[in-house]
Structures are given as C-alpha cells and as structure tokens.
Swiss-Prot record:
Sodium-activated and chloride-activated potassium channel. Produces rapidly activating outward rectifier K(+) currents. Contributes to regulate neuronal excitability. This is Potassium channel subfamily T member 2. Pfam families: BK_channel_a (PF03493), Ion_trans_2 (PF07885), Slo-like_RCK (PF22614). It is found in: Cell membrane. Residues 85-101, 159-164, 220-228, 250-256 are extracellular. Within the dorsal root ganglia (DRGs), exclusively expressed in small-sized and medium-sized calcitonin gene-related peptide (CGRP)-containing DRG neurons. The chain crosses the membrane at residues 64-84, 102-122, 138-158, 165-185, 199-219, 257-277. The consensus ATP binding site (1025-GPKHSGKT-1032) seems to be non-functional. One of its GO terms (molecular function) is potassium channel activity. GO terms for cellular component: plasma membrane. Residues 229-249 dip into the membrane without crossing it. Residues 1111-1122 have a biased composition (Polar residues). Homotetramer. Forms heteromeric channels with KCNT1. These heterodimer channels differ from the homomers in their unitary conductance, kinetic behavior, subcellular localization, and response to activation of protein kinase C.
Length: 1135
C-alpha cells in the first residue's frame, strides 16, 4: 500500500519562510471563495413571508392588527346605523341605499383599503400555484364583498351611500381570532388545551350568528316596522332561546326569509360545534386534562407513574398515603399511558377521592405530559413497575426509562422507584428510594424458614394501622393480635424525647429495657447525627448521645401521645377496667398495648399489687430454685456479655471428633467471591474452602465425585429447605445469603434444595457453588416423583415461589390458580409439611389450605368483610395462613415504598432486618423458642430483662401457636350437630363462664373450651341449612364423615408410598397423615410487659453483631477464602 504522506509533496522553502514571517496573512491573497448560505431567504417575497407568517412575534402583531381592524369596521357599521335617521316610506330603495356621512365614509374606505391590501398580500405570500384556491376561499370572498364597493365609491361618488354588509366582517374577525390564538401559543411557547380552543370557537360562532341576525333583520325592516338595534337584539335572543313571545316580529317577507335562513344556519353550525366540543370533552375526561399551574404552586402534590393502573394498586397507594395526618392536604396526580378502566373511574368518582386525586393519561417519557402533571413542582414522584407482565425484564426497562425521563425533566423532584429484577437496580441508583421486589421477596421467604412468619411481621410493621382491627371480635386472640398489629416504627431525637431523654449517657440495652418497662415502647435502633447508617441494636457497648436519633416500635409516635401520672390515671379510672379476665393487667401495660394516646408513667415507688412477680419457691423446694435475673446495667460490663443464645449454646460449633471425621468439607467465613448481579450488598457468610464442581450441585444426578441420586442418600443431619421456582433468577441468590450468614450457627444450617422448572444458568451456578449444602434439581411441584426425589418427605419447609409465566391472566385474580391448586395438592399429600407460598394477589390467600365446610374459616371471612367495611388497610390479617406466615404476596410490601415518603428510614430498617444489608455494629433478626425450662421467666418484661442483661438481645415480638383439638373431620360436621351443641351450651351458661380463660394462658387444657367458644361464634355468623332430628342421626353422620376422611387419607398415603417404592426410595419416616392437632398461630408485635409467656412461643430478637465484641474484628471481615489464612480467620471470628 502506498504511503499517504508520500503522495503530498512538501512546500518549497520560500513558502515556508514566508509563512513563518507573515503567519496567517500570507493566506489572504489566496484563491478562497466566500460562501453565503440560505440565499433563498434573502428574496423580497421570503422576507415578507418571514415577517407576516413565519416569525412568531411579528405574525402575532399582524393578526392582532387585522382582528382589531375587523372589529373597527363592525363598530363603524353600528355607528352608521345609530346615526341614521329613520326614513319614511317602504320603498325597496331603502334596502340598497343608506345615509352615510362623509367622515364616516372616509373611515370605512380607509379600513377597506387596508383590509383588502393585507388580504391580497397574504394571498400572494401563501400562493402555491393554484390561483383559484386563493380566490374561492370564503374569507377572501367576504373581504371582496365588504371592501371593493368602498374602493369603487372613491372613483364613483354616487355610490358613496350604497349599502355594504360590513357587519359580515364579524366572521372575518372570528377567523383572525383563531389564527391569533394559535400564534399566541407559539409566541409564548405554551399550548392551551384543544378544549379551550373549541370553547372559544363555539362562543365566537354564537356571537357572530347573533350579531349577523341583529344587523340583517334591522336592515331588512327598514321597509317595514323600522326596528332599531335593541329591538332586533331582543327578537334574536327570544327567537334563539325558543321562547318566542311574539311582541316583536318581522313584517316583510325578506326579513322573515332571512330569519328562517339564519335559523337553518344555526341548526347546522351549532350542532357541529357542540359535537366537536362533546368529543373533546370525552377525550379530556380520558386524558385527564392538565394539573393547574396555580394549584401546583400553592398546593402540594405527588405524582404516581404507572404503566397500567389496577384498582388494587390504586387503593393500596391511596389508603397508605392518606393514612398519615400531615398528607391529608396533598393532591395525587396519576400519570398513566392507558385509559382509565371502569373500576378505577368508579372509585375516582367517590367524593373522598375525586377532590384530591387527578388522573392524567400520558407518558412519563414525554416532556409535554410531565409538564401537564407539573412534575417540576411535585413533592415526590412514585414510579411503579407492572409486575403482572410475562416479560418482567421489559417492565423494568420501562421503569428505568421513566425514572431517567423524570430525573432529566425535574432533577430536584425526589424519586421513589419500584424495580422488579435486582440486576436492573444499579441503573436507578440516583433515585432517592428504591425497592427491589425480588430482593425483598426472597430474603423474606428465606427468613420465614428460620424465623417463622417473618413475612407477616414485616408486612404488619410497614402498614399504617391504629390497632383497632378485631376489637369487635368475641375471640381474645383476635383482639390481642389486632391490637398489636397497630405497632409501627417511629423516630425521634433523644434530647427531644420524653421516652428516652433520661437515658443519655446510658447503654443502648439499658435504654431499650427501661423504656419498654416504663412506657411500653421498644427501642430497636439508633443513628448518630453525623452518620447516615442506622444501627439495629448496637449492643450494650453503645452509649446514647443527646443528638442520637432513636428508632422505636409503638402504637403511635411520641408527638401524638399524652403522658399522665399513674396516680392521676388511677383516680380518673377507679371504676373502669380494660380487661376482665382472671389475670388482670396493670393499667399502664394495657394503655401501652391498646394504642391509646394516654401512656402511663409508672411510679416505681407505688407498684400495683396485682402486677406479675416471680413466685418464691417453697422452703422444701429451695434446691429447685431458678437463678434470678440480673439487672440491666447503665453501662454494661462487656466482659459478662454472652454472644450466644439465652437458652441453648449456639455460639459456634465445636464439633466432636466423630463429627469431624464424618465431615469432609471445612467451612470458612468470608464474603462470597462471586455475585450474580451488580449492586448486591456484600454479606459475611459461611463458605466452602473450595467451590463445589457444578456436577455436584445437581441433587438427583450422580457424578464422578458422589453417587447420590436423591436427598435421602445424602444423610443430612438437619431437615431440608426446598424452594420451588420457575427459573433460577438473580433474586434467588438473596434466598441463600440470609440462610448462610455468618451469624447463623453452623450446626443449624439447613440444606437448601432448589426445585427449578428450567435448568439454571452457568453464572448462577458460579454464585452458589461457594455455599455449603446448596443443591438444585430440575423438576416441578406438579410431579410427585420430583417432589419425592428432592426430599419433600423429610423437609422442614417447602417454599413455593410465584411463577412469572402465570402472573398475568385475562380474568382478575386467576393468575394464582395453578399455584393454589398445586399447593393444595401438597397440603393434602403431605399434611405435616410446612408450606410457605407466594401469591400474586393477596385476595387469593383465602384459598390456601381451603376447607369448603370449615365453619371457622367462614367466620373469619365474615370478619374480614366487616374489617374492610370499616376501612381497615389490614382486612386480610385474620386469615389463618397469613397470620401464621404460611402465605405472602409481594404486593403487600408496596406500602413500604409509599410509607418511605414520610418515614425515609423504613427501607433501610427493613433491609437490615431481612439481612439484605449488613452494617458493622448493626444487629440482625433471629428467634428463640420458649421451652418448659424457660417458663420460670413467666412474663415478657422479665424475658426482656433477662435478654438485655445476659446477651444484649432486644425482643420485638412473639410468634404464638395455640393448639386446636378440633380435627378436620369435626370441623365439617353437619349444621344440625352444631345447633345441638348450641342448645347444650345454653343449658349451662354458668358452667361455661366459669371455665372461660384468656387465650394467652399457658394451661393447655383451656384450648378445647376456647375452640368451642370459637365454633359458637362461627355458627352464629354462618348459620344455614336444614335441621335433623335426634342425637343418633348426628352421631352417625359424624362417624361416617370421620370414616370417609380416614379412608381418603389412607388412599393418599398408599399412593405416595407406592411411588416411593417405584423410585427405590425408603418409606421410613414418611408421615402417614394420621389425625394431627390443628394449630392457630399469630404474631404479637411489641406486646405489653405483663404478657405471659407460653410454651412453644417463638420470640423475635434483634441480636447485636457478634463481631462487634471482638477486639480485632475488622481483619476478620475481609474475604479470606482464597488464601492460606482461612483457618486462622475463622477461629478469630467465632461467635
């Protein structure tokens, strides 16, 4: 190839020397040509066109002048009519000739000359090759009719008094007005709605019709009654209003014919205008019009951007947003590209919402629509993804573009964004608050397996409630559960707080325990003034400062509370009692738990005699006396603080020699070396020394490293956690991480089996191959063989994740149909299996573990309807699967994003509780179970003290399970038996009252009576069906039903066993599904200090970071997997 540089010869030396001396001047005499652009605009015609048409401002001035000129001509016509003396006689000459003074004629001629010249000039400038198109236009014809006679009269004086219908210039004025409005919008760069233009055209058309009719009748009646302008106006108004009094009527046939013609014109023109106006009005109703600029500057509003608006999403947003008192005056502007559906339209017509919710149809990607919503003046913008889409990634991409568009248009508007896929989160890091659906969903489902009902706990915390749900119910558990559900997270500065001000300089655990003991509030976290990180239970080493921001759980925030001394409260409530059970609670405890604004300040010098105290052991039982509870120190002695569980040694696994020889894999602690997506928070975890080969991750396939083909062959010491999902998305990574976090005891790690419909990608396997005891298997919960191979018969929990391919359905709420039926099949086949299900729609949770003839479930359905009628945001909370944490819908967490508008810390606290974020010094959520050996503690307050003084843990709630000895078959007895029991109960009401006890009692013998009372209440709410006579018939019916149920269970058991034998699996340990006790589980968030502990209660704890107790904890936090010092690091970071 020829070198390009060699093709250009160098300059001679003299030119180079000249260039050195003269610089750029040496180029002045060269042959250069100056080129001028846009020469076509320099012609005379183009300059005129630029001035009269193209230039916005000059064109506006010309049209305004033209409009004024036409109005002036009409005004001169009126002046001529008023100055003219009525002529005598009825000759037709009066129609063609009028009396016009010379000055008036001169003015009209001048106006006509200017108008005609302007019309001809504009016609010339807009000429496009067809002269007839310009001549035959109606405005041009009217201009000729009104201007040419005056110009002719200049040269022919006898025509000066010729009648010219100058009043027709009103139509030219209307035409000029329309053009002027368009130019005005262009000049000020502001577009009015088409509705405004159409209304203006309609009004101007109506005025022109009336003015033309007035002037025409008045002129034609010059040969008749000689009406003046006022009489003509009166006649036109009466005629057009269809009243027609008949006192003023035209006499000549010409005027009558003119009236008929004008009425015909009106009947043609006005309906067309009204039709266009009605069409624009309907379109405006669909699109929503504009949000007023004046309102945007004087009132506060937020914008909700969604791709499609469903009624459930709308009501969740409105109920949660307007639940806060200070947001009552805010407007909500909804910006949605689709047309409003019928249900949404019906709701927005309710006066409560129509006054403060505005629906705009438009796209967030259009600046014009963002301007309509006044996004630059909005207090916040909520951007939600459409989760009911087959392609969720595409939905995320739309959300990302909306967020970018809003940030570009209004950079100062706070953004609250909901994203579906975690891999898309890093695109919107600039947003003020982001909730990633799959991150929260999988982390919550994972914690449900080790901390039961974590999903219910978080859902209740992020919903705004006053704790009034269930207070009308006759069942005590529903009252207590509903009352405690009103607890939320609030914040306050320590020095401004009555709750915590006295604990300045004290330890965190001391402040938390005494605040709960005194006020019933639970201090769970703190944040330094100069630090943005929130610390959950930083432990006893943390000393409270005056400027610290305290985060606490309570029924209401401190600012809305009033404080009364206990003596004053006792005097004002001598005859009042909040509770009439056997174990009466002190007033200060009940007020704190009931959620009233009056909170007792407990007087330590005057303690209620009925308050709970530890019973002293008898003299003969001193050898069995339990150790007393140590006091919580103001400044804790950290050398005495244990980093283990209260009741069992879970500190770290010192394995026995037998276990060491049987264990082939050594675990280390460190950060996972590979993350499946950008933006995942690093978490200190239990990891393997070396990653597992991909072939060994397959549970049901043997390889060269192991020969196991089913879960039973692995011989796991702990029960399995099975996750049934459609695909191994990146969000599934967040299910594994909380279960392998470093603070989980190694001995308690459960094997995780991923049952996937589709094989996982290689990058996902790269991420999970470092975690111990994580396997996958390709299969479906539709297939019994797949379930048996993955170890469902000895699994602790089965998590069924909602499938993306079924999230959208043509009929509302049918998206969960397949999931519900599959889970019901699992429930029938493996009744002892704990199944945790995710649904798309919360309304479908009523179908979980469905029993068609269960009266108690029917009664709960009635209760849910009543709570919804009372306006509760948590009407679904009394459904037994939700209360027990067996079912969850991610849409219930939408309120987390909405609540962040008022509580900007809620997302951070929720992420810390779920283990999605880990901050050095911040605690983590865990649980402990109350056994028989722990019942000596007796009350929640003493448990609080025991935990704070020994381990530094802070309890935040109780998961309570009550036994129900009514079997499934007994719940399906006939109505006649129920009514017979009703009659039996009525016969002995005194005995029934004497046996009634509180549901919080620890005596297990009370539960049958409680269940019997529940059945009575259920029968009252759902009584129906014919009566049967005789006790024998009822007993025979019940026996037949029990026999039918037993035979059905035996048939299912035989089916499962036969499949296991066919697959070569051992049937040992399979639950043959004998009658088992049904249970009722629910959560008590921040219960009162005097709540009695019961057997099998699970207490939610926020445990301090174990690494914060180590003197050299920072080096142990480094990733130490791929170096030789792993073992030393593991020893240093033991709990």
């Amino acid at each position: 190839m020829v070198d390009l540089e060699s093709e250009v010869p160098p300059l001679p030396p003299r030119y180079r020397f000249r260039d050195l001396l003269l610089g750029d001047q040496g180029w002045q005499n060269d042959d250069r040509v100056q080129v001028e652009f846009y020469m076509n605009e320099n012609t005379f015609k183009e300059r005129l066109k630029l001035f009269f048409i193209k230039n916005q401002r000059s064109s506006l001035r010309i049209r305004l002048f033209n409009f004024s000129l036409k109005l002036l001509s009409c005004l001169l016509y009126i002046i001529r009519v008023l100055l003219e003396k009525p002529s005598q006689g009825s000759e037709w000459s009066h129609i063609f000739w009028v009396n016009r003074s010379l000055p008036l004629w001169g003015l009209q001629v001048s106006v006509a000359l200017i108008s005609l010249f302007e019309t001809i000039l504009l016609g010339y400038l807009s000429y496009k090759g067809n002269i007839w198109e310009q001549i035959l236009r109606i405005p041009f014809i009217l201009e000729i009719i009104n201007a040419v006679p005056f110009i002719i009269s200049i040269f022919w004086p006898t025509l000066r008094n010729l009648f010219v219908p100058v009043f027709l210039n009103c139509w030219l004025a209307k035409h000029a007005l329309e053009n002027m409005i368009n130019d005005l919008h262009r000049a000020i760069q502001r577009t009015q709605s088409a509705m405004f233009n159409q209304v203006l055209i309609l009004i101007s058309t109506l005025l022109c019709l009336i003015f033309t009719c007035i002037c025409g009748i008045q002129h034609l009646e010059r040969i008749g009654k000689k009406l003046n302008l006022f009489d003509s106006l009166y006649f036109c108004i009466v005629t057009f209003s269809t009243v027609g009094f008949g006192d003023v009527t035209p006499e000549t046939w010409s005027s009558k014919l003119f009236v008929v013609a004008m009425i015909c014109v009106a009947l043609v023109v006005l309906p067309i205008q009204f039709e266009q106006l009605a069409y624009l009005w309907m379109e405006r109703q669909k699109s929503g019009g504009n949000y007023s600029r004046h309102r945007a500057q004087t009132e506060k509003h937020v914008v909700l951007c969604v791709s499609s608006l469903k009624i459930d999403l709308l009501m969740d947003f409105l109920n949660e947003f307007y639940a806060h008192p200070r947001l009552q005056d805010y407007y909500v502007v909804i910006l949605c590209p689709t047309e409003m559906d019928v249900q949404v339209r019906r709701v927005l017509q309710i006066p409560m919402w129509s006054q403060r919710v505005i629906y705009l149809q438009g796209s967030a990607l259009k600046d014009q629509d963002l301007l309509r919503a006044k996004m630059d003046n909005a207090e916040a913008c909520f951007i939600l993804s459409s989760r009911c889409e087959v392609d969720r990634t595409s939905s995320d991409h739309q959300t990302i573009l909306r967020a970018w568009a809003v940030k570009d248009f209004a950079p100062n508007c706070p953004l609250y964004v909901q994203i579906l896929k975690p891999e898309n989160k890093f695109h919107i890091k600039f947003a003020d608050h982001v909730v990633c659906e799959e991150e929260f969903k999988y982390a919550m489902l994972a914690l449900n397996c080790i901390c039961p009902a974590t999903s219910t706990l978080i859902t209740l915390l992020v919903h705004t409630s006053r704790g009034q749900e269930g207070q009308q119910s006759p069942e005590q558990w529903q009252k207590t559960y509903g009352r405690c559900s009103g607890n939320e997270v609030y914040h306050i500065v320590l020095e401004e707080s009555t709750f915590f001000a006295e604990y300045e300089g004290k330890s965190f655990t001391y402040a938390s325990f005494h605040a709960h003991k005194k006020f019933g509030v639970c201090l769970v976290g703190v944040r330094r003034e100069d630090n943005k990180n929130i610390l959950l239970n930083p432990g006893p080493r943390y000393i409270m400062n005056a400027s610290d921001i305290c985060f606490y759980i309570n029924i209401t925030k401190e600012e809305n509370s009033a404080f009364k001394n206990q003596d004053q409260q006792r005097k004002s409530n001598v005859s009042r009692s909040f509770y009439h059970g056997p174990s009466r609670l002190p007033v200060h405890s009940i007020i704190a738990s009931m959620g009233t604004v009056a909170i007792d300040l407990q007087d330590t010098s005057c303690r209620a005699t009925s308050g709970p105290t530890l019973a002293l052991p008898s003299e003969g039982g001193k050898e069995l006396r339990r150790p007393s509870i140590a006091p919580v120190l103001e400044v804790a002695d950290t050398s005495s603080i244990q980093t283990c569980d209260l009741l069992s040694d879970q500190s770290e696994d010192e394995t026995t020699p037998d276990e060491e020889t049987s264990s082939n894999l050594e675990y280390a602690k460190g950060y996972p070396p590979y993350s499946p997506y950008i933006g995942s928070s690093p978490t200190f975890c239990h990891l393997l020394q070396e990653k597992v080969p991909f072939c060994c991750l397959r549970l049901d396939k043997s390889c060269q490293h192991n020969y196991y083909e089913d879960a039973k062959a692995y011989g796991f010491k702990n029960k399995l956690i099975i996750v049934a999902a459609e695909t191994a998305g990146n969000g599934l990574y967040n299910f594994i991480v909380p279960l392998r976090a470093y603070y989980r005891p190694k001995k308690e790690l459960n094997p995780i089996v991923l049952l996937l419909d589709n094989p996982p990608d290689m990058h996902f396997l790269d991420a999970i191959c470092w975690f111990p005891m994580v396997y996958y298997m390709v299969g479906s919960i539709d297939n019994l063989d797949d379930l048996l191979r993955c170890g469902v018969t000895f699994a602790a929990n089965m998590v069924v994740v909602d499938k993306e391919s079924t999230m959208s359905a043509e009929e509302d709420y049918m998206a969960d149909a397949k999931t519900i039926v599959n889970v019901q099949t699992l429930f029938r086949l493996f009744s002892s299996l704990s199944i945790i299900t995710e649904l798309t729609h919360p309304a479908n949770m009523r179908f979980m573990q469905f029993r068609a003839k269960d009266c108690y479930s029917l009664a709960l359905s009635k209760l849910e309807k009543k709570e919804r009628e009372r306006g509760s945001n948590l009407a679904f909370m009394f459904r037994l699967p939700f209360a027990a944490g067996r079912v969850f819908s991610i849409s219930m967490l939408d309120t987390l994003l909405y609540q962040s508008f008022v509580k900007d810390y809620m997302i951070s606290i929720t992420r810390l509780l779920l283990g999605l974020d880990t901050i050095p010094g911040s605690g983590f959520l865990c649980s402990m179970k109350i056994t028989e050996d722990d019942l000596w503690i007796r009350t929640y307050a003493r448990l609080y003290q025991k935990l704070c003084s020994s381990t530094g843990d802070v309890p935040i709630g109780i998961y309570r399970t009550e036994s129900q000895k009514l079997t499934t078959s007994e719940s399906q007895i006939s109505i006649s038996v129920e009514e017979w029991e009703d009659t039996k109960d009525v016969k002995d009401p005194g005995h029934h009252r004497s046996l009634h006890r509180n549901s919080t009692s620890s005596d297990q013998s009370d539960h049958p009576l409680l269940r019997r009372k529940s059945m009575q209440w259920a029968r009252r709410l759902s009584r129906k069906g014919p009566k049967h006579s005789g006790k024998t018939a009822e007993k025979i019916t019940q026996q037949r039903l029990n026999l039918y149920r037993r035979s059905e269970r035996q048939e299912l058991a035989e089916l499962v066993k036969n499949r296991m034998k066919h697959l070569g699996l051992s049937t040992v340990g399979y639950d043959e599904m004998n009658d088992h006790q049904s249970t009722l589980s629910y959560i008590l968030i921040n219960p009162s200090p005097d709540t009695r502990l019961e057997l099998n209660d699970v207490v939610y704890l926020i445990r301090p970071d174990p690494l914060s107790y180590l003197p050299n904890s920072e080096p142990s936090r480094k990733n130490s997997i791929c170096n030789a010092a792993v073992q030393d690091s593991r020893e240093e970071t033991q709990l």
